[in-house]
Amino acid sequence: KYFYSIFIKKIIMKYLTPLEMLYKWESEKPHSIYLSQPINGIWHEWTFYEVGQEVRKMASYIKSLNLDKSAKIGILSKNCAHWIMSDLAIMLSGHISVPLYPNLNKGSLNKILLHSETQLLFVGKLDDFELMKGGIPSELKCITYPFYSQNYLIWDDCIKDVQPIQDNIKRS
């Protein structure tokens, strides 16, 4: 039993968290492409360094909002590069991601946002946001991803003049 316990701990300790993987590739292969996606027929690419900088800046911006400790932050979007970046920024800032299905109706969306006590919401690529937006409480601060303007604060504007977090913070 003792041997098994040590064996399991050694196996678990070899795995890196998503943030630790970002730090690793950010330093080892900064100019390699990490994320790419087509937007309006044009491919956009982000290197590990570029993703690291956006994540670090957004994490710094999130920290500047002085949210409650371990605040819940929602992500309402189909899969896209900024979904990954916002999830990493939430982790880096010390908060908790609340991923939301991109096809929720407004009633379900509202219940989840209220029940989870979400304090900030990222809004991105969605098929029919007009049917969903009524479920977002009016007092909830929202940030929209570039390329998907939903009349909220825009990601790029939020991080434009922000200093990135320099430390490689570890979360468990």
Residue ranges and their predicted role:
Residues 13-34:
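A short N-terminal helical cap/helix-turn-helix that marks the beginning
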